[in-house]
UniProtKB/Swiss-Prot annotation:
Keywords on record: Cell wall biogenesis/degradation, Metal-binding, NADP, Oxidoreductase, Teichoic acid biosynthesis, Zinc
Family named by the database record: Belongs to the zinc-containing alcohol dehydrogenase family.
Classification via InterPro entries: ADH-like_C, ADH-like_N, GroES-like_sf, NAD(P)-bd_dom_sf, TarJ
Pfam families: ADH_N, ADH_zinc_N
Species for this entry: Staphylococcus aureus (strain NCTC 8325 / PS 47)
EC number: 1.1.1.405
GO molecular function list: ribitol-5-phosphate 2-dehydrogenase [(NAD(P)+] activity; zinc ion binding
Pathway involvement of the protein, from the record: Cell wall biogenesis; poly(ribitol phosphate) teichoic acid biosynthesis
Cofactor(s) listed: Zn(2+)
Reaction catalysis annotation: D-ribitol 5-phosphate + NADP(+) = D-ribulose 5-phosphate + NADPH + H(+)
Protein name as it appears in the record: Ribulose-5-phosphate reductase 2
Stored HAMAP family: TarJ
């Protein structure tokens, strides 16, 4: 079967290429239905990655957040028409200690390997997770980002001290919003505070215990643990504030991505006995557990729906460009592509 793949060939320039798909191989053929644009996709689209990185990784199909529909499974494991969420991380080996998303041998879609902007995607059976029949597929298209937050929380749970009466989340964007939803559900007895820069964005966090602008944090405010969801240049200020307001032996989960090194007040880190926990991406088990949360707590999906900024019906290559350009100017939320091309 001939498949069309829509690749970024240079910043802001897409082209279509073709590949031959063996539908009778040991894989599942999935038709993407809804895709969601990530900040990492935008760094490629706008050319904000290092020039050597762009030269090495392009041309490449973008987007690693998507849901789709099974169109063919030669093994018969999944029925035709089954709605699934696709897992972008693809391991080539298993390790009894190291998680699949930290193995150097794993590859990740839309990061040096083609993402989900294709007519059909060839997926291994363990790289798709079936979804409930009545779920909102448009909202669930950004499940990958939910799984990233969930994975970070699980790492935090395993590595932190038992005292968990209060959490601080630095970052009022998409990742901060999702992390706040999950922390409120997984730790219902704990206080959850969100720290951000924009009143408009902070107004969406009505379900947490309190919100603060980063330049008006009370001096006496203390938290047990923190989640840094800022990224970029703001990571340094966020970490500075976290280290100042976190209690002794607290843990700091680092989720924000910065292209440049950031300074950390190691004197206070040592003095307070703090633990910094790095986290990146997620694996198939995280996706499975997130979908289980959707089933158990439908209100999670309702809150996630408020994160959707725009939904673009993509019928042509120009629609793809329009979607990425619109996403750049979006002040809040995720841009979803209804994939009808």
């Amino acid at each position: 079967m001939i498949n069309q793949v829509y690749q970024l060939v240079a910043p802001r320039q897409f082209d279509v290429t073709y590949n031959n798909v063996d539908i009778y191989g040991n894989h599942v053929i999935v038709r993407p239905l809804y895709l969601s644009i990530c900040a990492a996709d935008q760094r490629y689209y706008t050319g904000r990655r290092d020039e050597n990185v762009l030269r090495k990784k392009l041309p490449m199909s973008l987007v690693h957040e998507a849901v789709g529909e099974v169109v063919f499974d030669s093994k018969g494991v999944f029925e035709k028409g089954t709605k699934v969420v696709m897992v972008p991380n693809t391991p080539t080996e298993q390790h009894h200690i190291i998680a699949e998303n930290y193995l150097a041998s794993s590859y990740f879609r839309s990061s040096g390997y083609d993402g989900f902007m294709q007519d059909y995607v060839v997926m291994a059976h363990d790289r798709i997770v079936p979804l409930p029949n009545d779920i909102d597929l448009s909202t669930i298209s950004y499940t990958e980002l939910v799984s990233v937050s969930y994975h970070a929380i699980q790492r935090f749970e395993r590595k932190s001290i038992p005292l968990k009466t209060s959490f601080g989340i630095w970052g009022d964007g998409n990742l901060g919003y999702i992390t706040a939803i999950l922390l409120r559900k997984l730790y219902p007895e704990a206080k959850t505070y969100v720290f951000g820069k924009t009143d408009y964005k902070l107004s969406h966090f009505s379900f947490v215990d309190d919100i603060f602008t980063v330049n008006q944090i009370p001096d006496d405010l203390k938290i047990d643990h923190a989640f840094e969801c800022v990224g970029g240049k703001g990571s340094q200020v966020a970490l500075q504030q976290i280290v100042e307001h976190i209690s002794p032996e607290g843990s700091i989960a680092l989720l924000g991505v910065s292209e440049l090194p950031v300074e950390v007040n190691t004197r206070l880190v040592l003095e307070k006995g703090l633990t910094l926990i790095g986290s990146s991406r997620s694996g198939s088990k995280d996706f499975e557990q997130v979908v289980d949360l959707y089933r158990k707590y439908p209100d999670i999906v309702e809150k996630l729906a408020l994160l959707k900024g725009h939904e673009i019906n993509v019928c042509t290559m120009q629609d793809i460009v329009q979607a990425f350009e619109m996403d750049l100017s979006t002040s809040w939320g995720k841009t979803v592509l209804k994939w009808t091309i």
